């Protein structure tokens, strides 16, 4: 198992929050970070530390995308009209792997990325294996024939703690991305603070 693949299981513990709202999260059993020094008494966190943590939490939630990808997305958001934090959230929610996750075509964002990379997802009838692909309002995302029979899909759709948000219109084995959501519309299990992410990169 690669270090990057193994690290995903430590994201919740590192942040001390169950960022995906998973019943089996290790944070539900212990709230301190991973490693032998995880139980040390917490010291006062600086403004920089607070901003860094907000960035790590948001980046981690979206499948722990690389810093290069995340910063590039932020830079794009900062050049758009309107609030940069809101723009950042909108761009992240437009990722194909995230739309697949929101549609409950996969139980986790990591498995959603895998479903895309293995060629099981179609956008407007055309196969797409690029997880970071930008989905536009009106685009239809659907499952391939083989994917419809995968146990992974049935597992995801049976999860009671997750609902398909309003900006993803579900219709059987396909969904339509209806609009770019605002921060308040995104069903985060924990509080996200994109304004602090903006402050982090604006230093």
Curated annotation (Swiss-Prot):
GO terms for biological process: ribosomal small subunit biogenesis; translation. Keywords: Ribonucleoprotein, Ribosomal protein, RNA-binding, rRNA-binding. InterPro entries: Ribosomal_uS4 (IPR022801), Ribosomal_uS4_bac-type (IPR005709), Ribosomal_uS4_CS (IPR018079), Ribosomal_uS4_N (IPR001912), S4_RNA-bd (IPR002942), S4_RNA-bd_sf (IPR036986). Residues 15-46 are annotated as: Disordered. Pfam families: Ribosomal_S4, S4. Residues 94-154 form the S4 RNA-binding domain. GO terms for cellular component: small ribosomal subunit. Coiled coil: none annotated. One of its GO terms (molecular function) is rRNA binding. It comes from the Bacteria. Part of the 30S ribosomal subunit. Contacts protein S5. The interaction surface between S4 and S5 is involved in control of translational fidelity. Belongs to the universal ribosomal protein uS4 family. This is Small ribosomal subunit protein uS4. It comes from Novosphingobium aromaticivorans (strain ATCC 700278 / DSM 12444 / CCUG 56034 / CIP 105152 / NBRC 16084 / F199). The lineage of its organism: Bacteria, Pseudomonadati, Pseudomonadota, Alphaproteobacteria, Sphingomonadales.
């Amino acid at each position: 198992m690669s270090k990057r693949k193994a690290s995903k299981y430590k994201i919740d513990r590192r942040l001390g929050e169950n960022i995906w709202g998973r019943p089996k999260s290790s944070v539900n059993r212990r709230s301190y970070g991973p490693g032998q020094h995880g139980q040390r008494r917490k010291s006062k966190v600086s403004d920089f530390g607070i901003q860094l943590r907000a960035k790590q939490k948001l980046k981690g939630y979206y499948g722990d995308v690389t810093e290069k990808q995340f910063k590039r997305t932020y830079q794009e958001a900062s050049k758009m009209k309107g609030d940069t934090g809101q723009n950042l959230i909108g761009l992240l929610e437009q990722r194909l792997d995230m739309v697949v996750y929101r549609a409950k075509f996969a139980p986790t964002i990591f498995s959603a990325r895998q479903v895309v990379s293995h060629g099981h997802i179609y956008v407007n009838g055309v196969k797409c294996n690029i997880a970071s692909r930008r989905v536009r309002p009106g685009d239809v995302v659907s499952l391939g024939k083989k994917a419809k029979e995968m146990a992974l899909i049935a597992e995801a759709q049976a999860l009671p703690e997750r609902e398909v948000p309003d900006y993803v219109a579900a219709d059987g084995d396909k969904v339509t991305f209806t609009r770019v959501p605002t921060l308040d519309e995104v069903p985060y299990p924990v509080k996200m603070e994109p304004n602090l992410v903006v402050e982090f990169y604006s230093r």
